[in-house]
């Protein structure tokens, strides 16, 4: 059973911002934002043709500045946010804005993708998330499974909850929280939990992970030294409401039950340099991707702490034969965690990895040299999970 070869796409500029087009669940589509100091920056819309194993792309201009973070609306596939660098009065500020793609590009129905590089169209600015009072933006998070009307931005040591009004043409801060403490505190990453009616947020600053209740904008837990060095990324298990994964500059990936934060549930040490990105599969939470500046992407099968630690359980009522019943009991040993694959198509630091929103077995990774690689979960594992 041979697996399909990875598909590689090269951008002409350096890049570190990647997202799946969240609201698009029919086509496999990723958005990549570039980082160029000399030229106008771009957003590449990458369409993956699964049947022919090939990529179609279109390019939109993002002349506001180099892109550090990109995120797609969960409700409107034409709408996205970027965090980008802007120089003003000899200092660099990372700003954030909400944009709309031109109507003919949002659905990927462009006729001749090659022409778009020569005459790229510009994104339509819907509104700025005005951060002049709060400092540089680290990221913008859309409300999971929301209607595209609420976003959170992390700016320096502030959590800002925004309401987007009138087709996202205006953004107002509805509530905020500030991280208090010694020194210059600064958020590095955050994740809006899809559980608890989307009322919780996890943030990372320095080596700590904090949980926030968005109703009261107050802190609900703090894992003080979650990692030995800076925490780079977080992700919530989509199927287990208290479980959270984190990664950092100590080369480790850790799994937490936020009800018992004194120590991690599990720890992985497979990377040899900083781990920049960690992502749970949206459907099968045993599958976990990590990306690192050791230039590798690792797919792990963390089945023991997944929502199905025994695989698919068969109901005892379905087994009429007592002998079969005994054998079934023997088979109910927890399955073993393992590293499934190490993907080594990159030659530079891999800053981002994302699962497709349309195909649960497919993912993209992006390295700083502008190389985007599309890979799949090995077929043997896919069928083992499904059957």
UniProtKB/Swiss-Prot annotation:
It holds the Pfam family Beta-prop_EIPR1. InterPro entries: EIPR1, WD40/YVTN_repeat-like_dom_sf, WD40_repeat_CS, WD40_repeat_dom_sf, WD40_rpt. Keywords: Golgi apparatus, Repeat, WD repeat. It is found in: Golgi apparatus, trans-Golgi network. Residues 309-337 are annotated as: Disordered. GO terms for cellular component: Golgi apparatus. Coiled coil: none annotated. Gene3D superfamilies: YVTN repeat-like/Quinoprotein amine dehydrogenase (2.130.10.10). WD repeats lie at residues 132-172, 182-222, 226-266, 270-310, 345-385. Residues 315-326 have a biased composition (Acidic residues). GO terms for biological process: endocytic recycling; protein ubiquitination. Belongs to the WD repeat EIPR1 family. May act as a component of endosomal retrieval machinery that is involved in protein transport from early endosomes to either recycling endosomes or the trans-Golgi network. This is EARP-interacting protein homolog. It comes from Danio rerio (Zebrafish). The gene is eipr1.
């Amino acid at each position: 059973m041979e697996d399909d070869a990875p598909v590689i796409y090269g951008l002409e500029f350096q890049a570190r911002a990647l997202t799946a087009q969240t609201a698009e669940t029919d086509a496999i589509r990723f958005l990549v934002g570039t980082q160029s100091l000399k030229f106008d920056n771009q957003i590449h819309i990458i369409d993956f043709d699964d049947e022919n194993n090939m990529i179609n792309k279109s390019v939109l201009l993002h002349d506001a500045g180099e892109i550090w973070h990109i995120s797609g609306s969960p409700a409107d596939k034409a709408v996205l946010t970027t965090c980008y660098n802007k120089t003003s009065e000899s200092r660099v500020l990372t700003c954030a804005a909400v944009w709309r793609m031109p109507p003919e590009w949002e659905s990927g129905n462009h006729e001749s993708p090659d022409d778009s590089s020569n005459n790229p169209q510009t994104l339509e600015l819907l509104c700025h998330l005005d951060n002049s009072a709060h400092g540089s933006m680290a990221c913008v998070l859309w409300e999971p499974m929301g209607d595209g009307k609420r976003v959170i931005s992390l700016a320096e040591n502030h959590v800002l909850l925004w309401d987007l009004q009138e087709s996202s043409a205006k953004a107002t801060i509805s509530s905020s929280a500030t991280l208090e403490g010694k020194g210059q505190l600064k958020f590095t990453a955050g994740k809006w939990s899809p559980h608890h009616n989307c009322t919780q947020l996890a943030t990372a600053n320095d080596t700590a992970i904090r949980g926030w209740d968005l109703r009261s904008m107050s802190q609900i837990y703090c894992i003080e030294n979650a990692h030995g060095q800076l925490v780079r990324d977080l992700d919530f298990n989509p199927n287990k409401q208290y479980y959270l994964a984190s990664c950092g500059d100590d080369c480790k990936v850790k799994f937490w039950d936020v009800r018992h934060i004194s120590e991690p549930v599990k720890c992985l040490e497979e990377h040899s340099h900083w781990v920049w990105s960690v992502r749970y599969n949206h459907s099968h939470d045993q599958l976990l991707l990590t990306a690192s500046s050791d230039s590798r992407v690792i797919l792990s099968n963390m089945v023991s702490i997944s929502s199905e630690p025994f695989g698919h359980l068969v109901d005892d009522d379905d087994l009429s034969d007592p002998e079969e019943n005994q054998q079934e009991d023997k088979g109910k040993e927890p399955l073993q965690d393992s590293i499934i694959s190490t993907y080594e198509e990159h030659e530079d630091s891999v800053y981002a990895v994302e699962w497709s929103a349309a195909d649960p077995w497919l993912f993209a990774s992006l390295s700083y040299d502008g190389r985007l690689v599309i890979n799949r979960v090995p077929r043997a594992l896919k069928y083992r999970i499904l059957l």
